[in-house]
Amino acid sequence: MTNNKWQRSMYDHLFASKTIGSKAWAIKAEKEADFLVEALNLSPGAKILDLPCGTGRHSLQFARYAFSVTGVDISQSCIDIAKKQSRHKNVKYQIGDMSALQRFKSKFDAVTNLFTSFGYFSTDQENKAVLRGMVQCLKPGGKIVINTINRNFLLGVYKPALWTIDRDTITVQASIFDVKTKYNESYVCIVNEKTGVGTARYHRVRLYSPDEMLRLMKQCGCTKVKVWGDFDGRPLNKKSSTHPIYIGQKA
């Protein structure tokens, strides 16, 4: 598999503090976890693999339900934050690559892949192999969750350049979408106005339409795939749903 070193540092402390590590996103994660727990219908003590786990915001929420949670992420920075925030004995974090999951084969009742965390490898073949590897982490009958941005929606509102100001932070982003490969490349810069400290990151992800994602999940060993339009439980709208939730069962 292609070694995308940029993934390891994509969410450093500054990026994480404004997104996945922020208080607002922690509150959002609680709502999302509540929805998933009901949709997955897992038994008490079920084993969940949160992949990638980022700063552990969903892992912590799953732990509230007394599930045994393993959070895996390629970013040392994110894992460090997750461990500091951990309040539950039934959550364990470790460094790991989504393309190397053999040690987890058939060990989990559920695998969660949230916040558009799928599609980061260089080719469709590699991404497909990663999804198949996640499915193989499941016990027979286990369930996988994919929550990713809807390409149909994004292209309808696509902006190649944008910038935002949030209190003392300026964010500038430039993006390019390749209509042939369906990959979106972004260059993001975040600067703190007060301190002058800034960081820049490169981001490349394969975007999928709902039809593509459904087909891919079935090709990778999923059956009985259900789709929701959002974490409020609305039905999927193939054009306007922003981040659909796909739940499939291992055959």
Language model segments and positions:
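C-terminal lobe and adjacent flexible extensions of AdoMet/dcAdoMet transferase-like proteins
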Residues: 210-251
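Class I SAM-dependent methyltransferase "Motif I" SAM/SAH-binding loop
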Residues: 52-56
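A short glycine-rich, Lys/Arg-flanked "PGG" loop and its adjoining helix->strand segment in the class I
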Residues: 128-140
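Conserved class I S-adenosyl-L-methionine
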Residues: 1-46
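A short SAM/SAH-binding and catalytic strip from SAM-dependent methyltransferases
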Residues: 109-125
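Class I SAM-dependent methyltransferase SAM/SAH-binding core
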Residues: 57-100
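SAM-dependent methyltransferase
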Residues: 145-216
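A short acidic, Gly/Pro-enriched loop at the edge of an enzyme's catalytic core
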Residues: 102-110
